[in-house]
Each structure stands twice: as structure tokens, then as C-alpha cells.
């Protein structure tokens, strides 16, 4: 996230995908690339540069960042940024990844054509908690569960630092894949990831519902090889997602078991803060509440809390120590 003028944060809420014509120019970014996903001809690759919170394709990611700046502020801005050299970058990274993986995010900007004055790395759960309106600097323990597109990060925060954190390779995409597999098994129907996502949005629930709700989906019949339409129920979607949801619950319980008693009292009192785009799934809060006995705080725009938190860290000198220079010895 680059440093814009005070109080105007251009946030991008779009798919982190990039479409590249093989070995040539980038073609599309974000939602536009997503619309090509699974429809593109062989010479167009749709890549996901970040997988499970870690950079999987360095070149694609670098291209994507440069394109974002062109797209966000126009070509002039991008060229000015490359020439001017006074940009400040703040990058939120998962806490539970290796030092090398964290450094890769730093290198991404440092080795790009963007001239930078300052590159800072922020632990994502800290930015997340700040953006969610929690006071991260005091001695109170806060439990934050961020269920995103590709990962779920469960973190215990106190005194501006991370006490415990677990990063799971479970998120919206994993739910979509599970739905795709289950529909294939149950209905002999091959559906695309976008159709799976639509089923999730229409039918998913954190808690098994008594009432049956249905939604029609198009796909290719495995036996005949022909296009086919089937009616999928919410119960099937619940079955598809239950394993992933159980893993999230287990990880939350794991963090709670490892929480020091003083901080446990804080969490009993304040509950769990839920963020990330996947918290839009119906009854997911109810599931966590039932399984842990804790109250749940939900956000208005759960997918934007990290970005908001980064903005606060940039603008408020009191939060300076939450942003690390990778040369610092205090950053692990």
C-alpha cells in the first residue's frame, strides 16, 4: 500500500489475479483477469501471484504492482513514481510465515522500477486489529480471526505485538474448490470456480440449516460430456465446507489453549474480532460463537480492515514502532 495524500486511501477491492500473454505483455489485472479465468485461450495465462499469503510468482507480482499504480493513478503517476523516488511503501504480511518469505515482499518493491524513500513491513494481524478499531498498544489481549480469500490468520495480540499466530491455507478459494469437488462427486458435474463461488454466496452457512434452499448451476456432465444443469442444495454446500470450517475452529481452540491466563480473561470479556472477506458467509460468526462460547465482533467492511490499519500506521507517528524496517533486528 503506497502512501497517498493524507486521508485519501485508494483501496482496491478486486481479485488478486493477473492475466499474461505467454512471455509477453500483461493483459489484464484483478477483476478483469478474473473474468478471463477458466475462459482464456492457451496463450493467455491467468496467474495468482500470491498463494497462501506467500509470493508464489515474483515476476507476475512485480508486474501486477506496477500495473496497479498505473491503473490507480494513471501512467503519469507511475512514471513520476519511478523518477521521483519519494514514495513510501507499507506492506502487510502474515505473521506466521518465514523470515525469507517476509523479505520477499520487501524485495518485491526494493527491486522494482519504483523509486522508494521508505519500505516498511507491518504484521498483518496488527494492521487488521487497528483497522477494526481495536487499541493494539495497550496490555489487553485481543483475538482476531481473519478469514480471507486464500488464508485464515488467527492471532492473539497484546502491547502492539503478536503473542500467538496461526496461518491456515484455508479461505474463500479453498471453500470454492471444496464445493467444486463435492458437486463433481455427488452430481457427476464439472463446474468452474466462478460457479462454485456463486453457489457459496447463495447457499453457504456456518451452521447446518434445517430448511432446504436450492440453486441451479450449469456445468459439464462427466458421463455424457455435455453441458448440464443441476439443482444444488444448501445441505450439500454445508457438507462440502464442513472440513475446512472444522480446521478453522480447531485452530482457534489451539490458540485459546495457548493463551496466557491474564489474556484469556480479556478475550472472555471482549470476544473475538472477525475480519476478512470470507466473514460474509452466513452464520460463520454463529459457528465460532457456539464452538468457543465467546462473543463475536463483526466489521462493516471486513475485507478492508487491513488496508485501513495500514493507513492509520502511516499517518500516526504513535504507531511508528508497528512498522518495521527489514534492517531492524527486532523483526522476526
Feature-to-residue mapping (PLM):
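Positively charged, low-complexity, intrinsically disordered RNA-binding extensions
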Residues: 152-153
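Nucleotide/phosphate-binding catalytic cleft detector across ATP-hydrolyzing
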Residues: 1, 5-147, 156-272, 279-306, ...
